[in-house]
Regions:
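N-proximal low-complexity "stem/linker" segments adjacent to membrane-targeting elements
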Residues: 1-72
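Active-site-proximal specificity loops/subdomain of glycosyltransferases
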Residues: 47, 60-103
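Short beta-alpha junction loops
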Residues: 64-66, 137-142, 213-214
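Short, hinge-like loop/turn segments at secondary-structure boundaries
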Residues: 77, 150-154, 226-228
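Short beta-strand-to-loop acidic/aromatic patch adjacent to the donor-nucleotide binding site
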Residues: 101-113
């Protein structure tokens, strides 16, 4: 009952915020068919996402202390202090007509290290394979919370039953379906299992981890000693909230564990090039010169 009251209070807040949205910045019409959404503090890595050509618009919900920070980077901008998915829930219910104009939406932590070229490729892969939810694989230079999300060198993508909450990319209608059910009292722990449970029917070949696109999730040791999410709720609070949500919605997929069903192999030339890039500099130069000689011979 308390959770239902919390959700009702949350919805009332939406109505108020819709009437007083002076902090909003938005473009009149989308420039692209894809959207990246993030809830950003004052130490985000957002500039790295947009330095270069891109096939996506950017929505920033700022929860930091420096008023107007990142506003010039955003296509859509609002101010609200909460977690990533509660802030997304708020935005989705206040401005649903904006989200519905997009084909796909990447919901990303603000500290993820990734280039616009890689984000572009994620959206292209989603469309090519008609995926419902996907994520970039995690580079081992950063934090890896689930072994299944660690990049594998010889596959382009792996069909799985799991995508982590850190940076999931949704087909728009699938995100909308989850937003109808989601309760913003759940800040972090278990959100991924919940949105996967919503899509549990016929989701084979629709959920994937993309090894061809990697990102770095910075280690906690590189931050100021405390995770932003811990400022909202302690780990114990998040775990207890997740247990209550699981019971209320009969969510059982977490107990079944994470699985890979199938994979798409990386093309052989890409595998070979990646191997070359890991060789010593002198041997690399020899092989590249050999390639140039072969190409010159074939073109002559």
């Amino acid at each position: 009952m308390n959770q239902e009251n919390n959700k009702a209070a949350f919805n009332n807040e939406h109505i108020c915020s819709k009437m007083t949205n002076a902090s909003i910045k938005n473009i009149k019409t989308p420039c692209h068919k894809n959207l990246v959404y993030t809830s950003a503090g004052d130490n985000a890595n957002l500039i790295k996402w947009i330095t270069g050509n891109r096939n996506f618009d950017l929505w920033i919900t700022h929860y930091g202390n420096y008023q107007g920070r990142y506003r010039e980077l955003a296509d859509y901008y609002n101010i609200r202090k909460d977690g990533k998915f509660p802030n997304l829930y708020h935005a989705y219910h206040v401005w649903p007509y904006i989200f519905k104009q997009y084909e796909a939406i990447l919901v990303m932590d603000d500290d993820i290290l990734i280039s616009p070229a890689k984000i572009n490729r994620l959206f292209k892969i989603r469309k090519k394979y008609d995926l419902w939810i996907l994520q970039p694989a995690f580079d081992p230079k950063g934090k890896i919370s689930h072994r299944i999300t660690r990049v594998k060198p010889y596959t382009m993508l792996r069909y799985t039953n799991f995508v982590e909450v850190t940076c999931p990319l949704f087909r728009q209608d699938k995100l909308e379906r989850f937003m109808r059910i989601y309760n913003p009292v759940l800040v972090g722990w278990g959100v991924d299992w919940w949105f996967l449970d919503v899509l549990r029917n016929d989701m084979k070949d629709k959920i994937a981890i993309i090894d061809w696109v990697t990102c770095i999730n910075p280690l906690d040791s590189t931050k100021d000693g405390k995770r932003e999410i811990d400022r909202l709720q302690t780990p114990n609070q998040r775990l207890e909230t997740w247990k209550k949500i699981k019971r209320m919605h009969c969510i059982q997929n977490e107990e079944k564990g994470q699985m890979e069903y199938a994979f798409v192999p990386k093309p052989l030339p890409l595998i070979f090039v990646s191997k070359i890039l890991n060789l010593g500099q002198s041997l690399k130069r020899i092989i590249l010169k050999l390639f140039e000689s072969i190409r010159f011979y074939l073109n002559s």
